């Protein structure tokens, strides 16, 4: 756990909330990934390739509005550097009408036995003590990503260079829009014609930025670490659509 620059008060509150079970996920996400149906809706699993994590320090954000920001912080927990598969659970809400429910990265082929809210060390934990069910990351452009700290550095350089070449441009309309459409042609399952996901390879690198439709669009989305029986982190999960019967 990376606790550098985090106050003792925050760490004490984090540990207290953990002991009270207030950092736990409301559902077993692994069971949902194994299921074919949720609340009467068919579920499908959509592989999205792989992402490389050179440092193992990661976080989730909206790639269009936050990835190039200068104040991004990673989660306090870290994983072993490596290349890992990423996949999304898709719900068919109506005939040929799909929405993405969960996205996960798999670090180990072990079964999760518990989940913990992913945090960065600067959040107001009083929200959880006061009854809020989770703290999440904001989405303002309808997309989400999970990336490594090193990927952020590479993406910022790509973004800076692109805008130098296109000072009056819009990077989504003038660059990513076409990539989403091409991906929908190449992988039409569970996508609208304009595209609902890409696994973007940053030019001149081996680093990928998955950009994934965030459920019903803009909002605040929680991220959870999954731990196996040995206490090792085996997955990280973004929840786009609530999987809890209590909501």
Predicted feature locations:
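Acidic, proline/glycine-rich low-complexity IDRs
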Residues: 1-19, 149-247
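Extended, low-hydrophobicity segments enriched in charged/polar residues
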Residues: 4-182
């Amino acid at each position: 756990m990376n606790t550098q620059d985090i106050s003792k008060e925050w760490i004490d509150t984090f540990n207290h909330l953990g002991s009270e079970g207030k950092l736990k996920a409301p559902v077993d996400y692994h069971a949902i990934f194994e299921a074919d149906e949720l609340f009467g809706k068919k579920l499908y699993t959509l592989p999205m390739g792989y992402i490389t994590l050179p440092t193992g320090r990661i976080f989730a954000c909206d790639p269009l509005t936050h990835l190039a920001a200068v104040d991004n912080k990673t989660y306090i927990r870290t994983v072993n550097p490596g290349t890992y598969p990423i996949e999304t659970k898709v719900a068919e809400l109506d005939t040929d009408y799909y929405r993405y429910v969960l996205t996960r990265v798999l670090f180990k082929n072990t079964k999760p036995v518990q989940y913990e809210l992913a945090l960065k060390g600067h959040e107001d934990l009083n929200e959880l003590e006061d009854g809020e069910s989770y703290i999440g990351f904001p989405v303002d452009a309808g997309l989400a990503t999970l990336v490594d700290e090193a990927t952020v550095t590479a993406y910022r350089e790509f973004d800076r260079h692109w805008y130098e070449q296109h000072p009056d441009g819009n990077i989504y309309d003038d660059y990513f829009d076409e990539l989403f459409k091409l991906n929908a042609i190449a992988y039409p399952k569970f996508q609208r014609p304009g595209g609902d996901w890409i696994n973007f390879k940053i030019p001149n690198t081996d680093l990928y930025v998955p950009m994934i439709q965030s459920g019903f669009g803009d909002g605040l989305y929680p991220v959870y670490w999954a731990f196996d029986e040995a206490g090792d982190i085996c997955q990280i999960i973004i929840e786009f659509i609530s999987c809890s019967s209590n909501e």
